[in-house]
UniProtKB/Swiss-Prot annotation:
CDD domains tied to this protein: Ribosomal_L16_L10e (cd01433)
Any one GO molecular-function label of the UniProt entry: rRNA binding
InterPro entries in the record: Ribosomal_uL16 (IPR047873), Ribosomal_uL16_bact-type (IPR000114), Ribosomal_uL16_CS (IPR020798), Ribosomal_uL16_dom (IPR016180), Ribosomal_uL16_sf (IPR036920)
GO biological process terms on file: translation
Family: Belongs to the universal ribosomal protein uL16 family.
One protein family per Pfam: Ribosomal_L16
Disulfide bonds, paired cysteine numbers: none
Protein name: Large ribosomal subunit protein uL16
Gene transcribed to yield this protein: rplP
GO cellular component: cytosolic large ribosomal subunit
Amino acid sequence: MLQPKRRKYRKEQKGRNTGVATRGSSVAFGDFGLKAVGRGRLTARQIESARRAMTRHIKRGGRIWIRIFPDKPISQKPAEVRMGNGKGNPEYYVAEIQPGKVLYEMDGVDEQLAREAFKLAAAKLPLQTTFVIRHLG
């Protein structure tokens, strides 16, 4: 699963996910892309699950790019622990997703196969997505 090799600080504040994606909002590597319409967080497990679904569907053909990386640690307190006594330990990592962000890209397959693969991947993700095609020029 994806996670940072090392961080300057182990824990991070919650923060607010506002605005729309300006960087990473167009298809750059492949011919087809899966773009976020909604806003939210994707865990490393969700990103990997969607990647596996796509990879299985396109079999050996094509190439997939993951355009997001889970670099934000989410901490949790253990079960049945009283409130207070500091912040919990980092349990998993998430990627903060803004509307307009391209999540995955695909190349080397026809459009119909790409649409099917992205549909399988989108079912694994907790946000609304749309299929986009690269426009040259």
